[in-house]
Amino acid sequence: MDEVSLLIDLINNNWSSNATALVSSGDISASHAVVPEVIDIRTTAANKGVRVDLNQYPATIVVFEDSQNIEYPTVHYDVRHETYSFTLHIRVLHDERSGLDADYGKDRLRAIYLILRRVLESKRTGYTASDGSRFQQLFVGSRSESNDRAKRLFGYKVSLEAKRFALSIP
């Protein structure tokens, strides 16, 4: 499984339990504990990757792989460490369902961010997918806002670093 697919698998498989935990603790409202559409930006499928109709989903997370760095920590170069940098774009529309609630979009965005951060931090010491693909460490980095008030679109860009250690070289 490639790295972006592994990250999407991690998010999808751990979303519901972490959302439930945040609702139970009172950190987010149950109305904002929705399951987002997680999209690999490289996909060519219709309404995924290239153009996404945000009205179809309560929230969207678009995953980008920014870079990969390889280190050879031994004198013999027989193993390598890999570090991957990702950007996750969280997108939420402030729509008509909000009624008179002027903070609906901001509250939904905050809830999605808190769930995503909890998912990633809960697996900070590693995640293994069903096919054996694995990250040994995950680090949530910076967050920046990415809003478009004219389109009623709220968003965050979240950086993430994932590491794999001691991969043998054939």
Question: How would you label these PLM feature ranges?
Answer:
Residues M1-Y77, Y127-D131:
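Small/polar-rich, solvent-exposed N-terminal microdomains that initiate assembly or binding
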Residues N69-P73, L93-L100, F165-P170:
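Short, cysteine-centered beta-strand-loop-beta hairpins and adjacent loop/turn segments enriched
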Residues V38, T44-N47, T87, Y104, ...:
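General helical secondary-structure elements
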Residues A19-A30, T60-I61, K106-F165:
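Acidic-leaning, charged glycine-interspersed low-complexity segments
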Residues Y77-T83, R91-E121:
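Extracellular/virion structural assembly segments
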Residues D78-E96, K151-A166:
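Oligomerization/assembly interface segments of phage tail-like spikes and tubes
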